[in-house]
């Protein structure tokens, strides 16, 4: 009988230790997560409007400087818009080359580039529907001047992600960046864009479109675009394809601020 009691007591003590360990682990993870929040929402808005930041919005067919109201509305994580701009896009999703090419069938220079997009996803672990949607937004559905290649020294240079394309002279600066990177084919531009996004944003813990645009940990710094609707515009494209293909929307996080 004493042996049975000792075994039960030992088991009981072990269970208590496991429960305590689990509680401490939860508390520790919560504490670590909270420590990643650096600003309240209003503080983040103020920093985003600080000196040296650029916030643009499209009105009447042209880009103008965004007002504080425009910025605050765009940064609001509790708006009624879809949540895909808050989804982790640093993970691969399962798609066939045919499915990607079906999306691209009437998309200009991007037509039949499904294989390249999937290779970029596999090599750099960047969500392929994000890559496609971002490219479509930046290139006007594959038909913009920059998308179709800028000729220089007999070669054409391509830039599908607006990388290095500053607002005041997007075609010139975007093509110059593409030339420096030797993006001499659509495939190279797709692969190079994915590499750039992985290395410059995902490795900086900016894993969602919202984080790439607004950088909640360091508002006003290291942001992909100046357009206040940039993340929502790409997310709108993504939603169409996610819904059409019935792909699950995983790892959505909107808890950025104190």
Regions found by a protein language model. Give the residues of each.
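Catalytic cores of secreted/periplasmic lytic hydrolases that degrade extracellular macromolecules
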Residues: 2-129, 141-258
